[in-house]
Amino acid sequence: MSQIGAIFYIAWGLLHLYAAFQVYKLGKRQVAGMVQGRIYQSVWNLAAVAVAVIAVAVVYNWFNNPMGYWLNLALTSVTDVGFILFVVVRRYLPLWPGLLGPALWILAVLFSTLGQWVIRA
């Protein structure tokens, strides 16, 4: 189960690297200034979280490590809850593909949680 969860975390990370690139392209169209700088900062943060989630999935979640479970649960939850509240709920992005990231997040959490239950049973 934990390896399935790790695969979903890796997919989540790859999707968010793609999303970071899309936001970067949005930033390139802005006039140089504070708005462009803040967009680029958001790109940096999103890409960093995506890389961290992938690394944790490969190094820890794949082997059902409890520390990896909590790390990726926290990283992905904070990221996707903000996305849901500030982008999806406000309809700045259509539900599809807007809910793809949260769907991968829920599946990753579900399977990694099942994996944690197995080692405790």
Spans of model-derived segments:
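Interfacial segments of alpha-helical transmembrane regions
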Residues: 1-11, 68-73
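Helix-coil boundary and interhelical linker segments in multi-pass alpha-helical membrane proteins
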Residues: 1-4, 63, 116-121
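Core segments of alpha-helical transmembrane spans in multipass integral membrane proteins
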Residues: 14-23, 31-60, 74-79
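Membrane-water interface at the C-terminal end of transmembrane alpha helices
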Residues: 19, 105-121
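Non-cytosolic membrane-interface motifs at loop->transmembrane helix junctions
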Residues: 32-36, 68-71, 92-103
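Hydrophobic alpha-helical membrane segments
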Residues: 49, 68-86, 105-108
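Membrane-helix boundary connector in multi-pass membrane proteins
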Residues: 80-101, 115-121
